[in-house]
């Protein structure tokens, strides 16, 4: 299916209108939207590709727009950083009929100030993901853990990363 995008900060009514347009064009293939919320206060890190404001996933306008997705039985693909998992949990709790797809393992950061804290990050991530897993409206899409921000430096290799290399580096996340 097709996963599109709507800037959910435009408000519920405008979101509903844009979603109707997506449905008109995509028909049954249109399944929902993705809105990245990855934000971090460290200057050496980039925020996710939508350059979201801090606490996007708890913004009232954003949540009202998410409710429109839920009302239309469309999914919300969330991508945020490891320290924002609880924001997704609050969405799952607030909007229990909204189908939420967690992208990229919730973005464990492994560069900059987080480069030396990978084990600590994993333990917090594991606890937060376990809490999130209690919500039946949350699904996980595996992948996206080989990005430079994850700190594995696969992009610096001369040849493509193998499955064995991925498993060796990331097996505890699976």
Give the residues covered by each predicted segment.
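Helix C-cap/helix->beta junction micro-motif
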Residues: 72, 95-96, 135-136
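A short acidic (Asp/Glu
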Residues: 14-15, 88-89, 113, 152-153
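Short acidic/histidine-rich active-site segments
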Residues: 100-104, 141-144
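Active-site gating/metal-coordination segments in enzymes
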Residues: 1-84, 90-93, 106, 120-121, ...
């Amino acid at each position: 299916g097709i996963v599109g995008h709507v800037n959910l900060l435009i408000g519920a009514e405008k979101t509903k209108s844009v979603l109707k347009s997506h449905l008109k064009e995509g028909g049954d293939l249109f399944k929902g939207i993705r809105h990245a919320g990855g934000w971090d206060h460290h200057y050496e890190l980039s925020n996710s590709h939508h350059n979201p404001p801090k606490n996007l996933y708890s913004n009232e306008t954003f949540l009202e727009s998410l409710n429109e997705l839920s009302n239309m039985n469309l999914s919300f693909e969330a991508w945020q950083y490891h320290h924002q998992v609880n924001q997704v949990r609050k969405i799952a709790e607030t909007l229990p009929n909204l189908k939420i797809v967690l992208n990229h393992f919730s973005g464990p950061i492994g560069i900059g100030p987080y480069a030396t804290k990978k084990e600590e990050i994993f333990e917090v991530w594991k606890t937060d993901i376990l809490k999130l897993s209690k919500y039946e409206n949350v699904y996980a899409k595996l992948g996206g853990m080989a990005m430079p921000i994850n700190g594995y430096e696969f992009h610096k290799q001369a040849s493509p990363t193998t499955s064995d290399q991925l498993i060796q580096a990331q097996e505890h996340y699976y």
